[in-house]
């Protein structure tokens, strides 16, 4: 049984960024909310869109920060502090350059790997890196100088389909995480081939 109380999907705000690769974490939280029959609503107190869902009898908050990516910690910190949610009770979903579209993996802890959203969350959680992550593969442009344009760009239809397919599987694996445990959820998701 999971101890997760907060699931966060990282994104940049506004229509301009809604369909960009950098928003893959938000797409996951939006799909999880839809499957749970919840509506994400703007909440200025937490600088984001929030919802409250029940996953296998457990009360869980969903959050998509409405701050820009590099300020995601402001939103996560505000909600976590208010509800006294510890870092190890948080799952942050984010785009991952080092994995191909169609691949997603759960992970506990670790650094930020250059991801500015994770970097700010770690800073706002008093440098505690001990939260869970859902890494959603978006692929890499092949040139580090192209990364910014790449993550802020829209994926071609074939890649977008792979990302959406693995997000669907990640939602099913999240349900398994709450019904069973992290090991079974990881096995299912990590075995998936999109």
From Swiss-Prot:
Active site: 22
Keyword Hydrolase: yes
Subunit structure: Monomer.
Site (described: Discriminates between blocked and unblocked aminoacyl-tRNA): 12
UniProt xrefs under InterPro entries: Pept_tRNA_hydro (IPR001328), Pept_tRNA_hydro_CS (IPR018171), Pept_tRNA_hydro_sf (IPR036416)
Gene that this sequence comes from: pth
Gene Ontology molecular function: peptidyl-tRNA hydrolase activity; tRNA binding
Record protein name field: Peptidyl-tRNA hydrolase
Site (Stabilizes the basic form of H active site to accept a proton): 95
Function: Hydrolyzes ribosome-free peptidyl-tRNAs (with 1 or more amino acids incorporated), which drop off the ribosome during protein synthesis, or as a result of ribosome stalling.
């Amino acid at each position: 049984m999971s101890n997760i109380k907060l699931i966060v999907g990282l994104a940049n705000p506004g229509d301009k960024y809604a369909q960009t690769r950098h928003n893959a974490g938000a797409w996951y939280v939006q799909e999880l909310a839809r499957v749970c029959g919840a509506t994400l609503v703007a909440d200025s107190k937490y600088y984001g869109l929030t919802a409250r869902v029940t996953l296998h009898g457990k009360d869980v908050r969903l959050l998509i920060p409405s701050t820009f990516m590099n300020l995601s910690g402001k939103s996560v910190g505000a909600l976590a502090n208010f509800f006294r949610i510890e870092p190890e009770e948080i799952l942050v979903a984010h785009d991952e350059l080092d994995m191909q579209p169609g691949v997603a993996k759960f992970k506990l802890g670790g650094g930020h790997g250059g991801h500015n959203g994770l970097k700010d969350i770690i800073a706002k959680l008093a440098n505690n890196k001990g939260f869970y992550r859902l890494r959603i593969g978006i692929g890499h442009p092949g040139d580090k100088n192209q990364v910014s344009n790449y993550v802020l760009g829209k994926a071609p239809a074939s890649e977008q389909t792979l990302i959406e397919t693995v997000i669907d599987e990640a939602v099913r694996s999240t349900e398994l995480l709450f019904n069973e445990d992290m090991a079974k959820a990881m096995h299912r998701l990590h075995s998936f081939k999109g």
